[in-house]
Amino acid sequence: MNKGKYIFLDVDGVLNHHETYKKKHVNSLYPDLDPECLALFSKLVHSIDYVHIVLSSSWRLIESDMDRLEAAFKEFGIPKWIDITPYLEYEQGKTRGKEINQWLKENHVRKDQIIILDDNTDMADLKDRLIQTDFMNGGFKEVHLKKALHMLKGNHMTKETKEIFEALEAANNTLDNLYKAL
């Protein structure tokens, strides 16, 4: 299972955000997921050959959440995840990063083959593979898509590149806040 690229996907803060719950897409089977975030995620998945999704979200623990997510994926043409990360108990020092590391070890996947889409930072030694989204600021956005594509295509994340993406994200957040103020 070690060929290709892998996206470790959190749901809350990536495929939804605080505005999603205000809007509650009433005509949808998945009112707690944002259609714009799903469309961008679909674009990401279809832009990379041999990409696999591994669900690292707490949604993996609740069957009804996984059913809703699967329905949304189907509607947006996103392939179903190939696996879920193991659940570590708190006594084992549970963090999302440790769960992902455990999955990598069990499946013989290298760190340079992955990205992590998450709004949390508890990634242990995987922080350089994290594309951090923001639950309070729109979830998965175009800037995250561009950064994910950059990393999944094997491009090295230099200090300058990192600064460019940070500046783009800050500018994007400023624009979003200006639009909200109108």
Report the location of each language-model feature:
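Short, basic/hydrophobic alpha-helical segments
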Residues: 38-49, 102-110
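Short His-Asn-centered micro-motif
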Residues: 9, 56-62, 117-119
